[in-house]
Every structure is written in structure tokens, then in C-alpha cells.
Amino acid sequence: MQTRNTFSWIKEQITRSISVSLMIYIITRTSISNAYPIFAQQGYENPREATGRIVCANCHLANKPVDIEVPQAVLPDTVFEAVVRIPYDMQMKQVLANGKRGALNVGAVLILPEGFELAPPDRISPEMKEKIGNLSFQNYRPTKKNILVIGPVPGQKYSEITFPILSPDPATKKDVHFLKYPIYVGGNRGRGQIYPDGSKSNNTVYNATAAGIVSKIIRKEKGGYEITIADASDGRQVVDIIPPGPELLVSEGESIKLDQPLTSNPNVGGFGQGDAEIVLQDPLRIQGLLFFLSSVILAQIFLVLKKKQFEKVQLSEMNF
């Protein structure tokens, strides 16, 4: 009897462990599929390559514009706005993972100079919080607080993203200096064409993997196609699988060439990158400049007064 109870207890524990593991897997998989910045975070230690290219372009193949606006100069330990604009036609719809059409999402990566970081909530003004909305920013790495990522978020609401940034203070951070620094940004709208493992998404064009005659086209129940190509040279048959989403361009009996497009290109999004410069200004330099300008103005005033006094003396001598 005791052996049977022990066996039941072990069986219950194993079942519970499997259930917990399955739940963790589902949650993890869902978060990865819904948050594409994590692809870059998992695959690259730094999102900006030595060539200056931001790695998001490896998956988002189309080139689109992006714009960044930052102040020309900031003082130490100051919160300022870095505004990233990701423009696109709001009427456009993209191909979703299930092959249906839907609205575009946007995402961005902001690469700040060393020492600059996301401003803490208690330092952000109410006006800036209103511009930020419900956005949640995260660091690219726990050790890289100067690199921020956001997305995917609804493009119709957040085609303009405001990052709250805290400038460093050289008085407390000895590796930071009063200099001009570059800021780099990358922004995408819509889904990518290639996954990090090199496989294609359904948001791209599919080409023929062999030359020959299209002998059979099967429309799959859940969408997509199976295209059978009979190779004219050796008679072998090649089957190309088309996922749901792209529109078919070929028909049965048609002669096709190697790498000829079998589908349209459904992609309406793309990725772009840009840069800006910002000066970490020394307050003492500003004070010195103000003192210099004040001295110049006072000197001009004294010159004018001296000139008028001299003219009065000349006039009195002439009258005498």
C-alpha cells in the first residue's frame, strides 16, 4: 500500500513538472514571436556593426526613411527628449504571420553615447510623460544602458516615439567628458523578411528553386501553396512551399526559370537608420561666454558714453 502511494506521488510530481515546463515554453515562445527586438538582442552583442550598419537591416531588407531630433547641446545631469520619427502611409496593411492583412507595427533602437541613459520616472516631467504615452523602453543589455530598444508598438499611434534621456555628469563619471557625441538610430515599420536563423518569413517574395514546367499547384487548406516544378533537363520534380500571404504569379503549365519570382512581394514596410550629434556642454564655459558677452556690451556702452562726452567738450570749445 505504501509503495502504491509513493508511486502515485511521484507520478503527480512528474505531471506537475511537465505542465509547468510546458507553460514556460508557451509563454517564452509567445514573447519572442511578439517582440522582434529580442531577435537582435539574442543574436548580437552590439546592434551596430563595425561598418556602421545596424543589424536590424539583416532581417528588414527594404530601405525606408527614419528621422531623429535631439537638442544641439545639453547640460550635465539633465533630462531631454530624443524624438524618433518613423513615417509611412497609415492606409497600408501588411501581411501577418497567419497570412491575413493587418496594421503595421513599428520599432526602434537608439544608440546613445556612453554615460547617457534612460531617464528615471521621477525625473520625467508631466509634459514629457504625456508625449511618451504608454511606451515601455528597455535596455539592449543590462550592461549597456546607453542602448535602448522599443517595439513592436502600433504604428498608427507611435510613428513618432519620444525617448526620455538623462545626460551624464562628468563630475561623477570620470570617463565622460564635455564633448560633441554622435547618436545613432534605427527604425522599422512592418514585419521582417528573414528570421535570425536565415529562413524566410511570409512577408517576402518566393522564387523558383528549379527551372522547368509548373506541373501542379495545390492550394493548401490553411492557405499557401505547394508548387511542383518538373525539371526539363532530368525530369526530376521539385516542390516549392509557399506560405499564406504572398500572391501567386504563376499557373500550371507555365515554363519558368531558376530564381524566377513565384509570388508577389507583399512587403510594405522597411528599415532605416540615421544619426545626429549632441554636445555635452560645460556650465562653466557658458558662464564664461556670458561674462565675455557682458564685458563686450559694457565696453560698447562706455565707448558710446565716452564719444558723447568728447563731442560735448568739442562743442563747448567751439562756442568759447
From Swiss-Prot:
Coiled coil spans: none
N-terminal signal peptide: 1-35
GO biological process, one term: photosynthesis
Cofactor comment text: Binds 1 heme group covalently.
Record bears the keyword Zinc-finger: no
PROSITE patterns named among the record's database cross-references: CYTF
Ranges that cross the membrane: 286-306
Record InterPro entries: Cyt-f_TM, Cyt_f, Cyt_f_lg_dom, Cyt_f_lg_dom_sf, Rudment_hybrid_motif
Pfam families: Apocytochr_F_C, Apocytochr_F_N
Membrane disposition: Single-pass membrane protein
One MF term in the entry's GO annotations: heme binding
Localization per Swiss-Prot or TrEMBL: Plastid, Chloroplast thylakoid membrane
Needed cofactors: heme
Keywords: Chloroplast, Electron transport, Heme, Iron, Membrane, Metal-binding, Photosynthesis, Plastid, Signal, Thylakoid, Transmembrane, Transmembrane helix, Transport
Binding-site list for heme: 36, 56, 59-60
Gene Ontology CC terms: chloroplast thylakoid membrane
Family, per entry: Belongs to the cytochrome f family.
Function: Component of the cytochrome b6-f complex, which mediates electron transfer between photosystem II (PSII) and photosystem I (PSI), cyclic electron flow around PSI, and state transitions.
Subunit structure as annotated in this protein's UniProt entry: The 4 large subunits of the cytochrome b6-f complex are cytochrome b6, subunit IV (17 kDa polypeptide, petD), cytochrome f and the Rieske protein, while the 4 small subunits are PetG, PetL, PetM and PetN. The complex functions as a dimer.
Name the UniProt record assigns to this protein: Cytochrome f
Organism of this sequence: Vitis vinifera (Grape)
Organism lineage string: Eukaryota, Viridiplantae, Streptophyta, Embryophyta, Tracheophyta
